[in-house]
């Protein structure tokens, strides 16, 4: 399920949030799980919304994800997502599962919802139990609203080592109606999704069934959240949840709808925007790295090589040091299990071609260094084997990454 090559009519909403689509409210409070910052949030929908989710592939899937899957299994509808930071509630056994179910029950009771219309998410330190006394009191403090302040309170409540809030919003037209997609995400370390290592909450007022929404989300996740890496670690907790209120008033969307491409592109842009923000905010990062691979046998192989390059610690440290060592890029391509012709590969860093037909090209070290000092570094590779294309995003690897993770619990 993919968008066509035509340019879809999609517009970015600069100040848009998860409450910009019709029918959504949000809130965030300080419940005491963290020292002073907000740590408990909720997104609430006015009606039971069509819903879809994708989850971490970690064997140690955390308790909140199991509860969310149980909720969605009933009728694929959600009306609220309750989220805490500071404690992952992962590897916490039966007690952890019991606590996650209690979070769902408390949220449902607070807002008068059916139990199975509530999703639960947690992020933070693994192997610690939720302080349920604080969760119980905190949920009672949640008063959702539709203002920017309400959305930002939620966005702040879901952060861990993030340095900035991540939000995105796009609008399009379906059946002459304005359809909006808004999103909020967290993620800075343990970023190597499959689907994993981050949380994203996406809202839309599109009229769409849960089944069609799920297919679209799966397809888009593969070219957005699953194509980012910060440190190669996969989390126990993370997921993407999408809720669609249907309040835009359009005819129900399917891939056969004449405006399907518009909605699909708005959802894709929202996910890609959030994914790139997560990569840019990698722990200790100073630069966003974008790797574009073309000429692969298939799109899958192109995506695989792009992610291999952007995940290479040697490439990441070279970018941090503004060192145009293209041999590290070749090294990353070389240990990929995708098909490669080693006698015909092109490599460029930004506008500077460094390898053409697997032959080194003369280039100015000064120009290359100047380019690598920019906040966004683009690496392009052409394999000359087919039409496969893929993009991946990551960040440089700095001294601060070690400092942050050496003292994460202190």
Curated annotation (Swiss-Prot):
Leading EC class: transferase
Annotated pathway: Amino-acid biosynthesis; L-arginine biosynthesis; L-ornithine and N-acetyl-L-glutamate from L-glutamate and N(2)-acetyl-L-ornithine (cyclic): step 1/1; Amino-acid biosynthesis; L-arginine biosynthesis; N(2)-acetyl-L-ornithine from L-glutamate: step 1/4
Residues annotated as site: Cleavage: 196-197
Site (Involved in the stabilization of negative charge on the oxyanion by the formation of the oxyanion hole): 123-124
Location in or out of the cell: Cytoplasm
EC assignment: 2.3.1.35, 2.3.1.1
Cross-referenced CDD domains: OAT
Keywords: Acyltransferase, Amino-acid biosynthesis, Arginine biosynthesis, Autocatalytic cleavage, Cytoplasm, Multifunctional enzyme, Transferase
A single BP term in Gene Ontology: L-arginine biosynthetic process
Keyword Nucleotide-binding among record annotations: no
Residue numbers binding substrate: 160, 186, 197, 283, 405, 410
Signal peptide: none
Transmembrane segments: none
GO molecular function: glutamate N-acetyltransferase activity; L-glutamate N-acetyltransferase activity
Catalytic site positions: 197
Subunit structure and binding partners: Heterotetramer of two alpha and two beta chains.
Family: Belongs to the ArgJ family.
Record-given protein name: Arginine biosynthesis bifunctional protein ArgJ
Organism, scientific name: Geobacillus kaustophilus (strain HTA426)
């Amino acid at each position: 399920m993919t968008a066509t090559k035509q340019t879809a009519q999609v517009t970015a909403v600069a100040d848009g949030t998860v409450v910009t689509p019709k029918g959504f409210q949000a809130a965030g409070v300080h419940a005491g799980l963290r020292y002073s910052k907000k740590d408990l949030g909720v997104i609430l929908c006015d009606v039971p919304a069509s819903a879809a989710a994708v989850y971490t592939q970690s064997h140690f899937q955390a308790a909140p994800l199991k509860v969310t899957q149980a909720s969605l299994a009933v009728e694929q509808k959600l009306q609220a997502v309750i989220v805490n930071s500071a404690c992952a509630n992962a590897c916490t056994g039966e007690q952890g599962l019991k606590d996650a179910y209690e979070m769902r029950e408390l949220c449902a009771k607070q807002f008068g919802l059916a139990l199975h219309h509530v999703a639960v998410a947690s992020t933070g330190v693994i192997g610690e139990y939720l302080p349920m006394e604080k969760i119980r009191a905190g949920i009672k403090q949640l008063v959702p609203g539709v203002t920017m302040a309400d959305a930002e309170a939620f966005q702040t409540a879901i952060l861990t080592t993030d340095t900035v809030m991540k939000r995105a919003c796009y609008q399009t037209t379906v059946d002459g109606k304005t359809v909006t997609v808004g999103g909020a995400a967290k993620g800075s370390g343990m970023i190597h999704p499959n689907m994993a290592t981050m949380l994203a909450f996406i809202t839309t007022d599109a009229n769409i069934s849960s089944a069609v929404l799920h297919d679209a989300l799966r397809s888009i996740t593969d070219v957005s959240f699953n194509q980012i890496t910060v440190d190669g670690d996969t989390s126990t907790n993370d997921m993407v949840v999408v809720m669609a209120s249907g309040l835009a008033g359009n005819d129900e969307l399917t891939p056969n709808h004449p405006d399907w491409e518009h909605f699909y592109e708005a959802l894709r842009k929202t996910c890609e925007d959030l994914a790139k923000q997560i990569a840019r905010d990698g722990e200790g990062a100073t630069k966003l790295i974008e790797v574009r691979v073309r000429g692969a046998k298939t799109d899958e192989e192109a995506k695989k090589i792009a992610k291999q390059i952007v995940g290479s610690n040697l490439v990441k440290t070279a970018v941090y040091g503004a060192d145009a060592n293209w041999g590290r890029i070749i090294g990353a391509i070389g240990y990929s299990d995708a098909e490669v012709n080693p006698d015909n590969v092109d490599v460029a860093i930004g506008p500077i071609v460094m390898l053409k037909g697997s032959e080194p090209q003369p280039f100015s070290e000064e120009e290359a260094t100047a380019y690598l000092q920019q906040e966004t570094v683009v690496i392009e590779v052409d394999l000359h084997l087919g039409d496969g294309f893929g993009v991946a995003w990551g960040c440089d690897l700095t001294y601060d990454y070690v400092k942050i993770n050496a003292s994460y619990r202190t």
